[in-house]
Amino acid sequence: MKVSSQTTGELAENKFETIYDERYWESPPFKLVSDFEPKGSQPEAIEKLVDGLKKGEPFQTLLGVTGSGKTYTVANVINQIRKPTLVIAHNKTLAAQLYNEFREFFPENRVEYFVSYYDYYQPESYLPAKDQYIEKDAMINPKIEQMRLAATASLMSRQDVIVVASVSCIYGLGNPENFQKMGFELKVGDKVHRKEILEKLIDIQFERNDLELMPGRFRVKGDTIDIIPGYFDDIIRIELFGDEVDRISEVDKQTGQRKEDMDYFFVYPARHYVIPEEEQKSAIQFILEELEERLPELGLLESHRLKQRTLYDMEMIQETGSCKGIENYSRHFDHRQPGEKPFCLLDYFPDDFLLVIDESHQTIPQLHGMYNGDRSRKKSLVDYGFRLPSAFDNRPLKFEEFEKYMKNVIFVSATPADYEREHSSRVVEQIIRPTGLVDPEVEVRPLEGQVRDVMQEIRKIVERGDRALVTTLTKKLAEELTEFLAKNEIKARYLHSDIKTIERTEIIRELRLGKFDVLVGINLLREGLDIPEVGFIGILDADKEGFLRNSKSLIQIIGRAARNSSSRVVLYADNMTDSIKSAVQETERRRSMQIAYNEEHGIVPTTIRKPIREKVVDITDTKHIPKTDIPNVIIELDAEMREAADRLDFERAIQVRELIKKLEKEIKAV
């Protein structure tokens, strides 16, 4: 990372030895920048969470209703606690939203983004029933790869760091000790030969390219070396005078203008998987020993397949330093024992870092399930001679391994699950919204005539220009209800798991635009359904206990109407189940607290105004594209998909990817 002030501490005897000195400890404190002060439930929540962390309580839960400003509360906690922080979200889209929010709150500190760098990923697998081997197929997004490197480089060089990550942060990553040890520092006045610098850059996976400079590459012109580190946008220019570093400066990549001079610059490796040469040799020896042990355990075909593949991979590693699927040998390169956990992003943090798990009721189950899913896929690869058993150790963390990092944890959720409640020393509530919006009124009505009744309610809200959501228990009921409403001249659509992502997004967009008035669905808890135009929610068969009718699910469904100041919710039930009682009581408790706050502060709640996004493409348009034009259209769409991913607009990137797949199928069908 770049530093423009004088270094502290003496340069080690080996001029390329990593220095982890006072610069790390002297990094600036967090500085929260915001136009507003904590309000509503926020001040008390901030105070309690900070108090719990200072008292060394490892687990706390922030129970915050939608729209109460949970992210702002967490930002205030980070600002006071001043520890490097990891925020985990359960998908890329939510991670991108949090990343942008934290960047606005902390413009003077390092806010980084760490998610899977694949725009498209087909894992390696083998289907024994069909005798079908599926090779790994992936499309890496270079911008996200750059952001991942920036995250680890920041963690190595300063304390004022917030990393927003998806659950991919528990997957294997290069050894942080190697990443740190193989980096090197250059200072103005250093005695060093140009050849030494170039060799060191090659050692840490930089590529020389004198024509096209991009992250992870360098070029050489006489005594000037231009580098773009893998985690950087601009050029770092090293100017030598003989065998001495004469000048180090940052140069704008686009204009070529010098932006600033610096006293020194620390160059981290261009990739996370970097292995010192001596360790590479010993790792290859261990891999060959494992191969010899494994071959007698396999059949003739499988042993031949494994031997041929492994020897080829070792030859590639010796020649080029890498091979396809090198991560499957990571246990040997990391010198880990069989079954020992892999290194991951969490190992780049200091021991006492702050961990925030957003939407914990969804994120914790994801973290639980990662390991088993990975192992079951690899089992057939190992059993049939496509991979050595050590491939099992290229894996995500087991949940019990992840728990060992949970020393300062804040779970954030509107509906915390049993895990969070059982582990937390305190559950801090954040019920009052600074905006004044109140949870909707909830009414329970009998099952008899529920369809006719819900239809009457829909007509009322349509007259005032609002929309409605209706939840059913099965896909068949959703389709039948939609058809019944249509016959009664109510514009309705249904939404369920069979509908593709791109169509689902477009259905929600058309609901907001008023092209239809009612959306009928089964599980309306998924992201993307925060629709302020919704003024009524009807929950059919609410007394049928189960996943979609338990108290947590009911509270979440009711919360979908909390963005509209005049919204109402009706539950249709003959039996007041414990789940219904709990959901109604909790909603009424939250309503009364918010109403009292509004009256005390003279707040009149108003419906949230949320812009409606432009349509990306019309999927029906593909039928009208001439077959000869499809390849060019795919090229254009691929560029659009990458641009969307670069902007962290993953919803749009997924839409375009789905369209590309549709067009590729049409080409194959010709």
Curated annotation (Swiss-Prot):
HAMAP family from the xrefs?
UvrB
**Which SMART domains does the entry link to?**
DEXDc, HELICc
This chain's source organism reads: Methanosarcina mazei (strain ATCC BAA-159 / DSM 3647 / Goe1 / Go1 / JCM 11833 / OCM 88) (Methanosarcina frisia)
Subunit organization: Forms a heterotetramer with UvrA during the search for lesions. Interacts with UvrC in an incision complex.
| InterPro entries for this protein | Helicase/UvrB_N, Helicase_ATP-bd, Helicase_C-like, P-loop_NTPase, UVR_dom, UVR_dom_sf, UvrB, UvrB_inter
Where in or outside the cell it occurs: the entry states:
Cytoplasm
Q: Name one Pfam family in it.
A: UvrB_inter
About its domains, the entry says: The beta-hairpin motif is involved in DNA binding.
Name assigned to this protein: UvrABC system protein B
**Gene3D superfamilies given in the database record:** P-loop containing nucleotide triphosphate hydrolases, UVR domain
Cited PROSITE patterns: HELICASE_ATP_BIND_1, HELICASE_CTER, UVR
- Function of this protein? The UvrABC repair system catalyzes the recognition and processing of DNA lesions. A damage recognition complex composed of 2 UvrA and 2 UvrB subunits scans DNA for abnormalities. Upon binding of the UvrA(2)B(2) complex to a putative damaged site, the DNA wraps around one UvrB monomer. DNA wrap is dependent on ATP binding by UvrB and probably causes local melting of the DNA helix, facilitating insertion of UvrB beta-hairpin between the DNA strands. Then UvrB probes one DNA strand for the presence of a lesion.
According to the entry, every stretch annotated as the UVR domain falls at 631-666
- For this UniProt record, give its keywords in alphabetical order, as a comma-separated list: ATP-binding, Cytoplasm, DNA damage, DNA excision, DNA repair, Excision nuclease, Nucleotide-binding, SOS response
Q: Which residues bind ATP?
A: 64-71
Helicase C-terminal domain mapped to chain residues:
453-612
Classify the main location: cytoplasm
Q: Where is this motif: Beta-hairpin?
A: 117-140
Name any GO cellular component annotation: excinuclease repair complex
Keyword Iron-sulfur, does the record have it?
Answer: no
Check the record and name the NCBIfam families matching this protein.
Answer: PRK05298.1, uvrb
UniProt similarity note: Belongs to the UvrB family.
Give start and end of each Helicase ATP-binding domain: 51-433
For this chain's UniProt record, which GO biological process terms are given? nucleotide-excision repair; SOS response
Tell me a Gene Ontology molecular-function term this record carries. ATP hydrolysis activity
